[in-house]
Amino acid sequence: TLEQIPVLTTTWAAWKEAHPDTEVMSTEGGPETDMFERYYANDRNGIHSLNPSDKRLHGKDVVLGLDLKGEAKAYSYTALIEQPLVEETLGRQPIIVLHERSSATAVAFSRIVHGRTLSFKGKSKNPHRRSAEVTASGEGERPNYEPWLIEDTQTGSTWRAVSGECIEGELKGSRLEMLPGMTGFWYAWSRFYPAADLFGTLAESPE
């Protein structure tokens, strides 16, 4: 089995805010249009249009999937938008799953810091991302990115939700351990993990 490593699917603005010293290897290349736009919009599941065997979500509902010590669970992005901070235990490990709405970023961390299990609550606003921002052509100015901040209830320290970095308080300089997860479509995740638990329910189909 290949070792899983943590990866993050996010926006450039959110990444740059969390990692301002990032080196960009190239700004050239890339198509002017999204070649997968039609695929995202239609009901086809994969190249061969696989029918999801697990009907708890629509095939193309996006999930963050975790597999910790043999215990697997998927977190529906739709459900996380409504409840963007989830604390629980998975694989006998206390974890937190966060969804920053403005950057459409879902990420999971261990809640153990320096041998102590922390609990968290939101500190700053976590506004929904407006559709105009998602589909902007790049012309004109976009609203400034504001990172979502959370606070641990044990020390009152302030943390960035996307990077897991503590930026203020007793634990300043500490960083939550990011857990290996996979962001993908439900039809793909559920085929590899057919018995996995799910955070979220089937959304109403658009009329």
Regions found by a protein language model. Name each.
Residues 1-207:
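Mid-to-C-terminal functional-domain signal that highlights helix-capping/loop sites
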